[in-house]
Amino acid sequence: MPTKKKTTTKARKGTKKDFGEMTVKQVMQKMVQSAHLKTKGDVIASLMIEGFGAVPVVDAKDKLLGIVSEHDLLVAMDDGRKLGDVAASEIMTFNPYSIHPEAILPTLVHVFVASDLIRVPVVDAKDKLVGIIARRDVLRAYLSAGRAGC
């Protein structure tokens, strides 16, 4: 059964802190939809339709195990599989790249540039899922820091 964290976040508006010093925690989305290993693909697809482009897969203690992307679901469909018959564990990316909340945003910019990642799960020191951050969150933070003209 999917779980949903109950806190909300967005980039802090009006902050003029230097972008180079901003942390992932300041701009990450804390409201995260997650799934478990046995969550079916059609349930995950429903979450994605609600605006979540990737769904982290966690264990009972919210430890990050993997992530299912829109692409993963499309590959399953292209293979002729019914999403209602496919478990997250069958299509997810295991041990996805993740980042800690204290990491500075320029570090994440390098990750996004060097990879095809669009979203990165945010985990604490025990690999517990605490948020997710997307490319657009980083861009929003950059603009809110007043760096658009730089």
Predicted regions located by residue number:
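Tandem CBS (Cystathionine beta-synthase) repeat/Bateman regulatory domains
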Residues: M1-C150
